[in-house]
Amino acid sequence: MRRAARARIDLNALRHNLRTARRAAPRSRVMAVIKAEAYGHGMLAVARALAAQADAFAISCIDEARVLREAGVTLPLVVLQGFRDAAQLIEVARLGDVQPVIHSTGQLDVLESAALPAPLRVWLKLDTGMHRLGLPPGEAAVLQNRIAALPQVAGVPGLMTHLACADEPERPETGIQLQVFDAATADLPGERSIANSAAVLRTPAACRDWVRPGIMLYGASPLAGETAQSLDLQPVMTVSAPVVAVKRLAAGDAVGYGGGYVCQSPRTMAVVAMGYGDGYPRHAPSGTPVRVHGRRCALMGRVSMDMLCVDVTEVPGVAPGDDVTLWGEGLPVDEIAAAAGTISYELLCSVGGRLRLEYVG
């Protein structure tokens, strides 16, 4: 069931942000990351909007590849988690120009024994320091040669890694990871891909044949301590919901579950049809900003499943039906995430089935 709360998706802002990525990495091709429903923005709509600007799309799983191909999306697809078994691998081959990432010897064993309808392009992922997915860098040459020799594989496997600390450019880990990657792959053929959003913007040495911008495409900052606006990123998602009631409260009145917020003076409160069931962070504290009639107001009390309360004492004329902006245009999602003790990625991805996605541009 859809609620009155909605997320407006500005596709022109999305395209602007991809152009920002291209300017930051002018010698690289762009593998736009659209996994997890394009960080909550709607994978198919985002893929169609970027089809003329991106060079490929990065996705998480084969289910996403299937959805894109069935919808007529034809750009190359790189499956970051690769495949689980032979059945998935066969489906990848049938979908056409879907490129799985190989990050384990188990996947390589499956690839070697699979009878595929067509050879695949693949990527070899090296674990240079994040210690999540990837094979040992010291084995890169042996592994690449082993993969390239297979009849199931078309061409030379690409080489990729993922950066653990690129969002904090002053830390040494990114430089160390690049050194490990370069030492392991110096004499090897194949295209390279390293840079995520943060590295695209602040680590030119990581921008190789392909870059993989993700969060920056959606207008949030990937860098600790830097705003999206300062990075020439425009908000793509603006979440808003209507006021459903306005109440006058007396000094001493407590608001919400637990009564943790107590009015210190008479206040005017607006109840808004948005809650954690819609993807708003439950842990957002009192004082977290929202926008009402273009002015900043503050949350009062705990966020409920379907509602939250806002202090509109200083905003005259607020009435049921008025729109309240929870994040987006004029109110950066990074600011709301920081107030709630989380990251913008989580908020954007949390916008679930109850909200309408409305596309403009």
Swiss-Prot record:
Keywords: Isomerase, Pyridoxal phosphate. CDD domains: PLPDE_III_AR_proteobact. It catalyses: L-alanine = D-alanine. Substrate binds at R132, M305. InterPro entries: Ala_racemase (IPR000821), Ala_racemase/Decarboxylase_C (IPR009006), Ala_racemase_C (IPR011079), Ala_racemase_N (IPR001608), Ala_racemase_pyridoxalP-BS (IPR020622), PLP-binding_barrel (IPR029066). One of its GO terms (molecular function) is alanine racemase activity. Pathway: Amino-acid biosynthesis; D-alanine biosynthesis; D-alanine from L-alanine: step 1/1. Its EC number is 5.1.1.1. GO terms for cellular component: cytosol. Transmembrane segments: none annotated. Pfam families: Ala_racemase_C, Ala_racemase_N. Its cofactor is pyridoxal 5'-phosphate. The active site is at K35 (proton acceptor), Y257 (proton acceptor). The modification N6-(pyridoxal phosphate)lysine is found at K35. GO terms for biological process: D-alanine biosynthetic process. PANTHER family: ALANINE RACEMASE, ALANINE RACEMASE, CATABOLIC-RELATED. Catalyzes the interconversion of L-alanine and D-alanine. May also act on other amino acids. HAMAP family: Ala_racemase. Belongs to the alanine racemase family. This is Alanine racemase. It comes from Thioalkalivibrio sulfidiphilus (strain HL-EbGR7).
